[in-house]
Curated annotation (Swiss-Prot):
Homotetramer. It comes from the Archaea. InterPro entries: Desulfoferrodoxin_Fe-bd_dom (IPR002742), Desulfoferrodoxin_Fe-bd_dom_sf (IPR036073), Desulfoferrodoxin_SOR (IPR051233). This is Superoxide reductase. Its cofactor is Fe cation. It comes from Pyrococcus horikoshii (strain ATCC 700860 / DSM 12428 / JCM 9974 / NBRC 100139 / OT-3).
């Protein structure tokens, strides 16, 4: 049921889709997740990104692992933006999944392959 409510799209044309960018140095993985990279997302009490979650699903693993969650509680400061950086260690390949929640337009997802 939840699966049918999660939206996705091309982040270059849709401001709600989380953008996932990562760097790997040995086992240390640095992942930046942002919403509104190409088209800025509003950050007002009436329309904002409330949170971002990052998951890692290792190849051969049964379930994805929650790497972290960031909540954005200030929705009136023009200097804040929905962006978070996560660090974790793994030697495995797999998929990175990001979820973001817009208080008006709901859940949005994106995924990238971690090599």
């Amino acid at each position: 049921m939840l699966k049918e409510t999660i939206r996705s799209g091309d982040w270059k044309g849709e401001k709600h889709v989380p953008v996932i960018e990562y760097e790997r140095e040995g086992d240390l993985v640095k992942v930046e997740v942002s919403v509104g990279k190409e088209i800025p997302h509003p950050n007002t009490p009436e329309h904002h990104i409330a949170w971002i979650e990052l998951y890692f699903h290792p190849e051969g693993g049964q379930f994805p692992i929650l790497v972290g969650r960031v909540e954005f509680t200030n929705h009136s400061d023009p200097l804040t933006e929905p962006r978070a950086v996560f660090f974790f260690k793994t030697s495995k390949k797999g998929k990175l999944y990001a979820l973001s929640y817009c208080n008006i337009h709901g859940l949005w997802e994106n995924e990238v392959q971690l090599e």
